[in-house]
């Protein structure tokens, strides 16, 4: 399910002219009639796509038509889909004891579910440039893979990588195949294969390979704003994060804490710079407080996310333990919300940008990227 509706695969259909069986294609339904992977039987009408932008977006998903259901019976998911549904249900139950906004943020960080966000909070996150925190992507994949590899450090390399690959697959099932998730997962697979073969994985090559493979397998991703932002942010981090970090370290000096601050600053500025043209052209606004908000909020994200993951997983076998993990995550969630509230609710938090300025930014970022690549090759 997404903002365009729920994509459903048809395996059987009956109408006045006859009955059909097999892989019949996909249709788009309004809302989310059940957990992902749930089978359903419905009566309704197939509707052709309209000519408006919303219908065009639905068409680009590869669906054949819209489906307006008048009656629907939804079953329970089976197999791995059932496991994923259990983990999602556990995550939702574990945050019931938290303050509502903190619980909604936890679900956004862990499984990408932002349905609990109120309009004010959602707007604050957008204006403060923090919306990417609740769009599950590379950082979440890194946390999952890192945790599995560390916990399995005593195992053989092939077994550790196999467990990490399995955990990555389950993670994608739980959060859903969103564009940013697919990009991050594909890069994770490339990195795991490189480790298995004993080779070093170059981030830029991994990003290019992941982007090409995903675009070939799911051509509709090229129309996805989430995919554009995910690829652009990752490319920006690869190209400019180190240079930005070193620049700040020259100003504030060296040291472990200062190096950590420099790394956080570098990642934040590099990603913000890379996605700025896309945000300007699509939304017509840019966050003024984004770099500062990210610098303040991002340090709390790993702990809030890890504790949220632990709550979701342990909740499937021991609810009290999940409650403890959720309770421990509350201060970190509260800090992120505080940053969003104070840096995202003012009129000056974002600025309107004209299309001409957006294209100028696109040229600037492109030239900077090409220049960086040329300098690295010399």
Predicted regions located by residue number:
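C-terminal regulatory/interaction regions
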Residues: 315, 319-378
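Membrane-interface helix/helix-cap signal primarily in integral membrane proteins
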Residues: 1-132, 353
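Helical transmembrane-bundle signal
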Residues: 168, 272, 305-308, 337
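Short amphipathic alpha-helical coupling elements at transmembrane boundaries
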Residues: 93, 108, 123, 168, ...
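Hydrophobic alpha-helical transmembrane segments of integral membrane proteins
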Residues: 279-326
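Hydrophobic alpha-helical transmembrane segments in multi-pass membrane proteins
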Residues: 118-290, 354-378
């Amino acid at each position: 399910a997404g903002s365009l509706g729920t994509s459903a695969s048809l395996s059987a259909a009956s109408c006045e002219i006859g009955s059909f069986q097999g892989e019949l294609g996909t249709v788009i339904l309004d809302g989310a009639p059940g957990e992902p992977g749930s089978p359903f039987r419905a009566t309704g009408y197939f509707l052709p796509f309209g000519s408006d932008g919303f219908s065009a977006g639905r068409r680009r998903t590869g669906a054949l038509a819209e489906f307006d259901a008048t009656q629907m019976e939804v079953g329970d998911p089976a197999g791995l889909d059932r496991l994923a549904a259990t983990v999602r249900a556990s995550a939702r139950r574990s945050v019931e004891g938290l303050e509502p906004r903190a619980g909604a943020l936890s679900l956004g960080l862990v499984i990408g579910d932002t349905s609990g966000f109120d309009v004010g909070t959602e707007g604050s996150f957008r204006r403060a440039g923090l919306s990417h925190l609740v769009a599950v992507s590379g950082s979440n994949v890194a946390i999952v893979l890192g945790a599995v590899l560390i916990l399995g450090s005593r195992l053989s390399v092939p077994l550790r990588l196999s467990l990490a690959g399995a955990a990555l697959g389950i993670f994608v099932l739980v959060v859903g195949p969103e564009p940013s998730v697919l990009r991050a997962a594909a890069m994770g697979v490339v990195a795991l294969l490189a480790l298995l073969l004993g080779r070093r994985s170059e981030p830029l090559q991994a990003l290019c390979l992941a982007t090409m493979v995903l675009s070939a397998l799911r051509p509709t991703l090229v129309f996805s704003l989430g995919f554009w932002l995910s690829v652009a942010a990752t490319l920006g981090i690869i190209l400019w994060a180190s240079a930005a970090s070193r620049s700040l370290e020259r100003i504030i000096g060296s040291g472990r804490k200062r190096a950590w601050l420099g790394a956080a600053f570098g990642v934040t500025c590099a990603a913000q710079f890379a996605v700025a043209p896309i945000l300007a052209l699509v939304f017509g606004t840019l966050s003024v407080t984004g770099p500062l908000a990210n610098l303040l909020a991002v340090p709390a994200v790993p702990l809030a996310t890890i504790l949220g993951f632990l709550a979701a997983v342990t909740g499937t076998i021991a609810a009290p333990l999940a409650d403890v993990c959720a309770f421990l995550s509350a201060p970190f969630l509260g800090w992120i919300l505080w940053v969003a509230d104070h840096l995202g609710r003012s009129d000056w938090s974002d600025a309107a940008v004209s299309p001409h300025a957006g294209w100028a930014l696109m040229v600037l970022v492109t030239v900077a990227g090409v220049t960086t690549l040329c300098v690295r090759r010399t």
